[in-house]
Regions:
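FIC/Doc superfamily catalytic core
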Residues: 1-250
Length: 250
């Protein structure tokens, strides 16, 4: 991977990490960079992280992998961590490494719902047995997302339209940005997973943008502004998201 592309990927991973509320340390940057430059593998660095942080696989299979531990809001996880703040830090760190791994790969997949589920499944596979699974509970966070009963049918409508739009290839920049904002808003409203929706969707649309002949300068994206734009898009107002993308789509 060329040095300019490596830095673009680092900027993307840093954005995700900081959007989760964490500082992207020099050590974390070096770990991601070593994967992008193919000096280390994600498997090696994840195993090292697990050992250095004294984590142990203590998972006992449950009937509902999408459930939370009793009297907590913490998802069932391979390390049986029940303290949500601790789990979120582990999740963010390991997801960064899997994201770096996926960014080194060429995407031969169709940009469909199965691929979005694959991204989520790989990104969080080291933490959650439920990675890649569609949520079965109602979700709300400043707005109400798609009811779980309708996720599959709504996804079929969204991705069918994306397919008919040729995955946004061959468009001029203005039309591309408008269409990208629309589909980003639709997936945000779909919110198909119990957790990790934003990171999975961002990687999906980042790769789709590159595939369509564009790029995104993540170093210029303000996480709070993007969040507000995403919420507006869920409600059918795409202008804030279009304004954000106008500044960062290359």
């Amino acid at each position: 991977m060329k040095s300019g592309r490596v830095q673009a990927c680092i900027d993307y991973i840093r954005f995700n990490h900081e959007a989760e509320g964490y500082e992207f340390s020099e050590e974390e940057e070096q770990s991601a960079r070593s994967i992008l430059e193919e000096e280390s593998t994600a498997d090696e660095l994840i195993q090292r992280y697990i050992e250095e942080h004294g984590l142990a696989m203590q998972y006992t299979k449950t009937s509902d992998e999408l459930s939370v531990y009793p009297d907590t809001s913490t998802l069932v996880n391979f390390f049986s961590i029940k303290e949500r703040s601790k789990l979120r830090k582990v999740e963010a760190s390991l997801a960064n490494l899997r994201t770096a791994e996926m960014l080194t790969e060429s995407v031969d997949n169709t940009y469909d719902f199965e691929y979005l589920k694959t991204i989520h499944g790989r990104m969080f596979s080291d933490v959650y047995p439920s990675a890649g699974q569609i949520r079965t509970t109602v979700a709300a966070k400043r707005t109400v997302f798609c009811h779980p009963t309708f996720i599959e049918s709504a996804a079929e409508d969204i991705f069918s339209r994306l397919r008919k739009e040729h995955y946004l290839k061959g468009l001029d920049r203005e039309i591309f940005i408008n269409d990208l904002a629309f589909f980003m808003g639709e997936i945000e409203a779909l919110h198909p997973f119990r957790d990790g929706n934003g990171r999975a969707a961002r990687l999906f649309f980042y790769q789709l943008s590159v595939h369509a002949g564009f790029d995104i300068d993540w170093s210029m994206v303000d996480p709070d502004r993007l969040l507000e734009a995403d919420i507006s898009a869920i409600d059918g107002d795409y202008q804030l998201l279009i304004d954000v993308l106008e500044e960062v789509v290359l």
